[in-house]
Amino acid sequence: DVSDGDIFGFAMNLDAASGSKTVIVQKNGSTIDTVTIPTANEDNIFIPIAGDTSGTDSILKMNFGGTPNPTPSSAVSDANGFGAFEYSPTIGGVAYLALCTKNLGSNG
């Protein structure tokens, strides 16, 4: 179920050295699913897509750690000090990073 104001988080681990590549899905700061990317697809390009099939007008806002609108009430940064997230991007002891040019190459 999705309600007005729900915040979804997506954390991707595509680091080959870490073992299996995964996508973690969170709703309001709690993990609701972890998807392991099959080996046959691990070299593919991943593009985030969101949609609504309810048949009513909806607004979906995406934030990849940049300057969100509206500003999160908690505004948590990643381990490198970048991003503005409503919930901590550290999940299960893994410090996920904001998708920004300053983080590219810092860990991958």
Enumerate the predicted regions with their spans.
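PRY/SPRY (B30.2) beta-sandwich protein-interaction domains
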Residues: 1-108
